[in-house]
Amino acid sequence: MVKAVKGQAFVVTAGHAAPASIGMLVHQTDDLVTDGDGALGVTFIDNTTLSLGANSKLIMTAYAFQPRAHRFAFAATLAKGSLMWVSGRMTELAPDAVALYTPFGTIGVHGTRFLVEVDR
């Protein structure tokens, strides 16, 4: 769910860009995009928090958080820009189910907070 928006930020679903607004739901295959003055904060149901800086693009490829069914997945690619990550419950319950990809490598997330920047 979108928790914070500054400037131009968008949630892209099936190729359709919608201006991000507080309370907007983010689905497992959405892209998150910010322009030059944009910033976007998103919190997922496991309490993982992502903050995108200006000129950023995050491509979501998988998200599942179903502890009772033992189904966990979080995969995304930071194609450009900056991202602050604060881990939620998924990294406690299934750390190997979480991965952040960049054009330069993969970050395995095991219960932490970090900032990553991709220059393209």
Regions found by a protein language model. Give the residues of each.
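Flexible, surface-exposed loop/linker segments and immediately adjacent secondary-structure boundaries
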Residues: 1-31, 36-39, 44-120
